[in-house]
Amino acid sequence: MCGRFTLFSEFDDIIEQFNIDQFLPEGEYHPSYNVAPSQNILTIINDGSNNRLGKLRWGLIPPWAKDEKIGYKMINARAETLSEKPSFRKPLVSKRCIIPADSFYEWKRLDPKTKIPMRIKLKSSNLFAFAGLYEKWNTPEGNPLYTCTIITTKPNELMEDIHDRMPVILTDENEKEWLNPKNTDPDYLQSLLQPYDADDMEAYQVSSLVNSPKNNSPELIESH
């Protein structure tokens, strides 16, 4: 799964790397060393002509949901079953997004009682993007609430020693294909959702301070 990540890169670097044409005011971007579910996170969609950077709440709420509690259970979506699940079938075809990040955290189980937090990043330290889906849900008051989920897949050789799932990190080319609204074939779209090349990634243990979303400082990414 993917339940925590970082995004502390410079705002201008995000705009440049992902070819953003329309974006929220820079003052609304808050670098984070501990992005957690239920927070409003930076996301990118394509409207058919432009890449747009905005915010969606992490934890997808389907349009048919009775209340927003289901969102806490839907922070991730399995790549292998997207086209089978009622919550993800339609957004797979028409509501895709990418989520910029510079690393993510996963907890490695050492024994039944012990788990240690690991930080996983690209060896290059470059920005990357998770594949995601988004949805619109209307609150009981009739206000629209836009939410998203991060897609996971089977682990690569690096991740399989840490966890049995990993977030889908898209290659540059697959980012474009994933965002392109003209792509509507579920089989093709799911073929883009592959484990990232382990040779280009690295992982190391970090402080247990990351366990709490309340903690958010540069020391969270320091090797422990």
Curated annotation (Swiss-Prot):
Keyword Zinc: no
GO molecular function, one term: peptidase activity
Keywords in alphabetical order: Covalent protein-DNA linkage, DNA damage, DNA-binding, Hydrolase, Lyase, Protease, SOS response
Keyword set includes tRNA-binding: no
EC number assigned by the record: 4.-.-.-, 3.4.-.-
Domain of life: Bacteria
Activity regulation as described: Formation and reversal of DNA-protein cross-link depends on DNA context. Catalyzes formation of the thiazolidine linkage in presence of abasic sites in single-stranded DNA. Mediates the reversal of the thiazolidine cross-link in presence of double stranded DNA.
Active site, UniProt feature: 2, 106
Annotated positions for site Required to stabilize abasic sites: 163
Gene Ontology process terms (BP): protein-DNA covalent cross-linking repair; proteolysis; SOS response
Thiazolidine linkage to a ring-opened DNA abasic site PTM sites in chain numbering: 2
Site, as annotated: Required for sensing abasic sites: 106
Role description: Sensor of abasic sites in single-stranded DNA (ssDNA) required to preserve genome integrity by promoting error-free repair of abasic sites. Recognizes and binds abasic sites in ssDNA at replication forks and chemically modifies the lesion by forming a covalent cross-link with DNA: forms a stable thiazolidine linkage between a ring-opened abasic site and the alpha-amino and sulfhydryl substituents of its N-terminal catalytic cysteine residue.
Domains (record comment): The N-terminal catalytic Cys-2 residue forms a thiazolidine linkage to a ring-opened DNA abasic site. Glu-106 catalyzes reversal of the thiazolidine linkage; self-reversal is favoured by duplex DNA formation. Glu-106 is also involved in sensing abasic sites in single-stranded DNA (ssDNA). His-163 stabilizes the abasic sites by forming a hydrogen bond with the O4' hydroxyl group.
Similarity-based family: Belongs to the SOS response-associated peptidase family.
Name of the protein described by the UniProt record: Abasic site processing protein YoqW
Lineage: Bacteria, Bacillati, Bacillota, Bacilli, Bacillales
